[in-house]
Amino acid sequence: MIERIKKFLRTKFKPLLLLLVTVILYNGWTPHLGIFPPTFYDFAFNYYGFVDILTFLVIIVIAYKNDAFKKIFDIFRPKNLLFILFFIVGGNIFIALAHHLYFQMTPALEAFPEHSIDLANYFARTPFWTHSLDLFVIGPISEELIYREYLYRLFDKKCLACFVSVTMFAWVHTGFTYSFFLYLPISLVVTLAYHRRKAIGESIALHSSINLINTYLPNLLSFWVF
């Protein structure tokens, strides 16, 4: 038993700590979590863009120091570029078809996740550059570090890590509601992009592309941003 604890501390404690620290830096300064004193949240609200960028830079430095981006430049190899293109096109088509089926089978009042409503409210009260930065840079990079890079490091079996990653990403965004099945195909596609060779650059590119298509090309693919 003692040896197992020592082994856990030696191999799994660091990625668990990285995951928790990144979650706090990414989401911890939002008021509904109540982690920090009210005065901090007042400051964060008044200087939202500054706090957002500052915490993101800390996330990037921590990730870089812990080799999260060691395969990042491999993304420019022809084989990997073709893979990303395939996943962007094929993945988005799969998601659109899955969501079409979802909306056919789900009661109207249950179809739209609260997270999507929160995002719509967020768009209305923040400048264009701020929510664009969140949607296409900060959000995808931070969430891929949390749900793919660090979460995968906690498991010795890659297939188990894939299952947990897919489930956790969808659940955190929706809870166990009907809309869980709205986010599930998105989570599956992005996780599989990472799963192939555990390269975070590819899942970030796919994550950002899904947000981009969903935000600016709603008539092409009808699914909700994550």
From Swiss-Prot:
It is a multi-pass membrane protein. Disulfide bonds: none annotated. The chain crosses the membrane at residues 16-36, 43-63, 81-101, 169-189, 206-226. Its main location: membrane. GO terms for cellular component: plasma membrane. Pfam families: Rce1-like (PF02517). One of its GO terms (biological process) is CAAX-box protein maturation. InterPro entries: Rce1/LyrA-like_dom. GO terms for molecular function: endopeptidase activity. It comes from the Bacteria. Keywords: Cell membrane, Membrane, Transmembrane, Transmembrane helix. It is found in: Cell membrane. Belongs to the UPF0177 family. This is UPF0177 protein YbdJ. It comes from Lactococcus lactis subsp. lactis (strain IL1403) (Streptococcus lactis).
